[in-house]
Structures are given as C-alpha cells and as structure tokens.
C-alpha cells in the first residue's frame, strides 16, 4: 500500500515537472516534444510520456497563446467571419490573416492523419530526436544569418502561408520544433525575427488544439490515457504548461526583437550531441 502511494506521488511530481518543461520549451525553437521525451527518460518512471500526454499538455500552452493574443485573435476571427457574409473584403489585413492561418494549418492536419501511427511510435526514437535537433539547428543558423529580415506580416502571401504550413508539419517529428520550423521558414522568406515568431504562434492554434482535443477524445472514449500518467496528472501538467507558457511568450517576443537565434542554435547542437553520447553509452534507452 505504501509502495502504491509512493508511486502515485512520484507520478504527480513527474507530471508537474513535465508540465513545466512543456511551458518552458513550447514557444522556443528547441522542440518541446523532444524535451518531454528526453526528460521523461531520466525520471523515476524512465518512460516516454507518450504522444497523448504531449498533445494534451500542449492545449495548456496554446491556451496561453489565445489569452496573450486575445485582442488580435478576436479581431482576426471577426474580420474572417465577415468575409463569409461579404461584409468584409477578402483583402482586409485581418481577414487575410484568418485565411492564411487556415491555409497554413492544412499540411500538418493532413500529414498528421496520414502518418499518425509513425508519429506515435517509430518517430519518437531518441536517435531521431538527436538528429533532428542538430540538423534543424543548423538550418535555423543559416536562415538567421542569410534572411533579409525586412518583411512584416502585412506582406505575408498565400504562397508563403503554405510554405509556413509545410514547415510546421515537419514538427510532427520530435526534435524538429514546430516554432523552430516555422520561424526558420519565415526567416528564409525574408520576414523579421519578431514577425516570424508571431505568425508561428498564431499558426499553431488550429493544429495544436485539433491534435490535443483529438487525443483527449481518444482518452475519454477509451479506458484512459496510455503511458505512466493518468488524466488527473496530465491535467495538472497542462495547467502548469499554461501558466509558464504565458510568461515565456512575452519574454521570447522581447528577446527576438533585439537578438539573433544563435543561442538556440548552439543549445540544439549541444543537446543533440549530448543525446548521441548518452545513447551510445547506454545511459538512456532510445
């Protein structure tokens, strides 16, 4: 009995810690899913938190986006809805942004459904995570160095919106980073660091909420969530992710308005190499 109580307490602690990790890393170009996978390997349960846990806790961080940008989002939704009744012209900047978010969300929705089984199994290997951290870290470094960084979101085109969307879809592979992929795409297309980050946050809302609610539906319609953490522990992690994520959004936007992404590039490369060593010496299992 005491052993069972101890196990329950450990699960709550681990879930809270993973919620903190999710909130700290979701909006930074360093891959929150990779960090959940890595940190989970070092915890007493030494288990992958699972795709369902990851997707549901992301509901917390995306709720933080909605709260942080609520004025922008209300304005965009109103203008977009107005185009459906022709009260607002389709070239209205806010209405266009609404359509661009929808358009940019299509690739990750389609590819996520097609490759769902692989995403929840083989692609969660830490060998793949380590490789993606390094490879996409180097791509981010190139984009940050060569991007013109002169375009604002008012100049976002539908073609660029699709390109953003496919970059976001790459984040279905843990280690790529959803924000990292979309920010990299924005820099390569000449957008400023802050503009690339802002659109990245808005673009994530439909896809992440769709994925999280789908996983939540699967959990509620079956016996429960798979993995070491039950629904109550996952709810705690989601709440913590929301609070921490809200703070990180403001800090990150301020940071990238005056500095480069070099810090995150070096961090990704260091973490990827460290992960290779840990896996190679069997300190953790893939």
UniProtKB/Swiss-Prot annotation:
TM region(s), chain numbering: 50-70, 97-117, 126-146, 156-176, 200-220, 236-256, 264-284
Root EC class: hydrolase
Compartment(s) of residence: Cell membrane
Major site of localization recorded for this protein: membrane
Catalytic reactions on record: di-trans,octa-cis-undecaprenyl diphosphate + H2O = di-trans,octa-cis-undecaprenyl phosphate + phosphate + H(+)
Enzyme Commission number(s): 3.6.1.27
GO molecular function: undecaprenyl-diphosphatase activity
Gene Ontology terms describing biological process: cell wall organization; peptidoglycan biosynthetic process; regulation of cell shape; response to antibiotic
GO cellular component, one term: plasma membrane
Region forming the signal peptide: none
Membrane topology: Multi-pass membrane protein
Domain of life: Bacteria
Keyword line: Antibiotic resistance, Cell membrane, Cell shape, Cell wall biogenesis/degradation, Hydrolase, Membrane, Peptidoglycan synthesis, Transmembrane, Transmembrane helix
HAMAP family, per database record: Undec_diphosphatase
Misc. comment: Bacitracin is thought to be involved in the inhibition of peptidoglycan synthesis by sequestering undecaprenyl diphosphate, thereby reducing the pool of lipid carrier available.
Role, per record: Catalyzes the dephosphorylation of undecaprenyl diphosphate (UPP). Confers resistance to bacitracin.
Family the UniProt entry places it in: Belongs to the UppP family.
Protein name from the UniProt record: Undecaprenyl-diphosphatase
Source species: Arthrobacter sp. (strain FB24)
Lineage per the UniProt record: Bacteria, Bacillati, Actinomycetota, Actinomycetes, Micrococcales
């Amino acid at each position: 009995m005491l052993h069972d109580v101890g196990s329950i307490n450990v699960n709550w602690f681990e879930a809270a810690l993973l919620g903190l990790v999710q909130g700290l890393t979701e909006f930074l170009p360093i891959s929150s899913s990779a960090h959940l996978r890595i940190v989970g390997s070092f915890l007493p349960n030494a288990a992958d938190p699972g795709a369902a846990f990851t997707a549901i806790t992301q509901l917390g961080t995306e709720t933080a986006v909605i709260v942080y940008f609520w004025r922008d989002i209300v304005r965009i939704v109103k203008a977009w809805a107005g185009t459906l009744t022709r009260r607002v012209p389709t070239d209205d900047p806010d209405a266009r942004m609404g359509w661009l978010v929808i358009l940019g969300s299509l690739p990750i929705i389609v590819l996520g459904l097609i490759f769902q089984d692989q995403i929840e199994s083989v692609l969660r290997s830490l060998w793949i995570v380590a490789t993606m951290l390094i490879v996409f870290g180097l791509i981010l470094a190139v984009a940050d160095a060569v991007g013109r960084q002169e375009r604002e979101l008012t100049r976002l085109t539908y073609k660029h919106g699709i390109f953003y969307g496919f970059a976001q879809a790459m984040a279905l592979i843990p280690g790529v980073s959803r924000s990292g992929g979309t920010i990299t795409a924005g820099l390569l297309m000449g957008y400023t660091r802050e503009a690339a980050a802002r659109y990245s946050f808005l673009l994530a809302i439909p896809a992440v909420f769709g994925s999280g609610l789908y996983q939540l539906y699967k959990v509620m319609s079956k016996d429960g969530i798979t993995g070491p953490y039950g629904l109550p522990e996952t709810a705690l992690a989601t709440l913590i992710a929301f609070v921490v994520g809200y703070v990180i959004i403001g800090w990150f936007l301020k940071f990238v308005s005056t500095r480069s992404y070099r810090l995150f590039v070096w961090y990704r490369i260091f973490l990827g190499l460290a992960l290779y060593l840990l896996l190679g010496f069997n300190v953790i299992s893939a």
